[in-house]
UniProtKB/Swiss-Prot annotation:
Function: Trans-enoyl reductase; part of the gene cluster that mediates the biosynthesis of HIV-1 integrase inhibitor equisetin and of fusarisetin A, both trans-fused decalin-containing tetramic acids showing also antimicrobial activity. The PKS module of fsa1 together with the enoylreductase fsa3 catalyze the formation of the polyketide unit which is then conjugated to L-serine by the condensation domain of the fsa1 NRPS module. Activity of the Dieckmann cyclase domain (RED) results in release of the Dieckmann product intermediate.
Membership in a protein family: Belongs to the zinc-containing alcohol dehydrogenase family.
Enzyme Commission number: 1.-.-.-
Record-given protein name: Trans-enoyl reductase fsa3
Lineage, top ranks: Eukaryota, Fungi, Dikarya, Ascomycota, Pezizomycotina
Annotated binding of NADP(+), by residue: 45-48, 166-169, 189-192, 207, 254-255, 344-345
């Protein structure tokens, strides 16, 4: 039996996060699984869990890796067993499920969203996979609706723009776009050109070059129909809208997009997504991040996680570069501040527990 209480990072009454050693360990029922956390990663979303997004007492954190400690009675479909090394992304700071979050000694997840960590990857590398590959999968194959997928590639090698290719979501997107049979066209600073090429980018452009959009249009014969914006600012949206070909297309961001920019091209369909939508449950965060329960999203989540399992099993995807720190949950608080201050560049910040 596991202990009754645990240490975790939880929301405070004044909209912050603190370390607590008297938190409840998640109760395991149905198809849920209890995991002893071994490593966690800090993501930009963690920096946004402040103020009205904080539920007092709710556990924070999204990305984790660990060892299966207990399996619910109905968790029988995905061959998850006690002792398995697993990772995934869950929804931390969840007012509807406050005992579950990544930044804790123990966490829980439904069995279908768990990924088994292959032998060639460490817990620290596993902890970096969840948000990056789940969010980009949702963006590319649900929101943008790319024909084909990494297990059944498209027959036409269309160009797909990945803006911000050297980010963690960018390198994940480049790999998935290429595996799905498309040509990943990406942007980053020149110092990261070789990095994004190593992940499969077919062409790379310096977003600071004044001729960048013209060069992309020339390279793609003005035929980009799909754009994933991994940076998701007004400026990056304007860039993507200008780079999309004359026939229009689809644009997906990872944050709410500018309605003013959206109005500049009626032939481009904009959207923005959040990774937790794949759970299919209500996201009870303040507007504009509130979402109703959506069974169709949940079905996509089951489908996409199964795709990711096969990609991992066959060593077809690899994680973003990571920087590993020790010090446990107490140091995660410092890590959140470092991400907020943009002190970490080009790598995912991971902590061992």
């Amino acid at each position: 039996m596991v202990q009754r209480q645990q240490t975790a990072l939880v929301g405070t009454d004044d909209g912050g996060i603190r370390l607590s050693s008297t938190e409840t360990i998640p109760n395991i029922t149905g198809d849920s699984v209890l995991i002893k956390t071994k490593a966690v990663s800090v993501n930009p979303v963690d920096t946004k869990m402040i103020g009205p997004y904080v539920t007092p007492g709710a556990v924070a954190g999204f990305d984790f890796a660990g060892v299966v400690e207990m399996v619910g009675p109905d968790a029988t479909k995905c061959d998850i067993r006690v002792g398995d090394r697993v990772c995934t992304a869950i929804m931390g700071m969840n007012p509807l499920d406050p005992t579950v979050g990544a930044f804790a000694e123990y966490t829980a997840a439904v069995e279908w969203i768990l990924l088994k960590i292959p032998p060639n990857l460490s817990f620290e590398e596993g902890a970096s996979l969840g948000i990056s590959f789940m969010t980009t999968g949702l963006a590319l194959f649900k929101s943008l609706g790319l024909p084909g997928n990494p297990l059944s590639p498209a027959t036409e090698k269309l160009p797909v723009l990945v803006y911000g290719g050297s980010s963690a979501t960018g390198t994940a997107a480049i790999q998935l776009v290429k595996l799905a049979g498309f040509a990943p066209i990406t942007t980053c600073s020149p110092r990261n050109f070789e990095l994004v090429k190593s992940y499969g980018a077919s062409a790379v452009f310096d977003y600071n070059d004044p001729d960048c959009i013209r060069d992309i249009k020339k390279h793609t014969k003005n035929n980009i129909r799909y754009a994933l914006d991994c940076i998701s600012t007004t400026q990056s949206m304007q860039f993507c809208y200008q780079a999309i070909g004359r026939a229009g297309g689809k644009y997906t961001a990872l944050e709410p997009f500018s309605e003013a920019v959206a109005r500049t091209r009626k032939m481009v369909k904009p959207d923005w997504i959040m990774g937790p939508q794949m759970l299919g449950k209500e996201i009870r965060w303040p507007e504009p991040h509130w979402r109703p329960a959506n069974a169709e999203m949940g079905e996509f989540g089951v489908y996409w996680t199964a795709v990711l399992r096969k990609l991992l099993d066959n060593n077809l995807i690899r994680p973003h570069a990571i920087v590993v720190r020790e010090g446990g949950l107490e140091k995660v608080l410092d890590g959140i501040e470092d991400i907020r201050a943009k002190k970490i560049s080009g790598k995912k910040l991971v902590f061992t527990l």
